[in-house]
Amino acid sequence: MATANKTKGQKEELITALYCRLSVDDDNKDMESNSITNQKQILSDFARREGYRNTMYFVDDGISGTTFQREGFQKMQNMVENGLIGTIIVKDLSRFGREQVEMGRLTQIVYPSLGVTFISIQENVNTATKTGLEMMPFYNILLR
């Protein structure tokens, strides 16, 4: 099974998941930078610039990051578990979630074991690199 979906020599093209989330609480804090529309633009620009194709948006609007029982997230997670997604990209780690233990389990154990790369643009984290994988625990602690 292919584990990445960049344009270079890919035989089997896996989906690059572009995940967006906006909490009800976020609505009043920084509407412009955290809006779903803005997140989609940032994610699509990054994916295009870095050569990721076959992108698909997964969106949770008005859902807290303290739970992973979110419709868009669950759909993405099911596709990950079925081997359809090779990369997950988020604008920043807080968009992915705010629950430290589950975030760590997914980004440091589950995704690497399934060959899925996790990228957070703002924190410049890419778990396909040794440094990116090593930095994830520190970022998860900072999100508390």
What are these regions (language model features)?
Residues 1-144:
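Short, structured surface patches at the beginning of a domain
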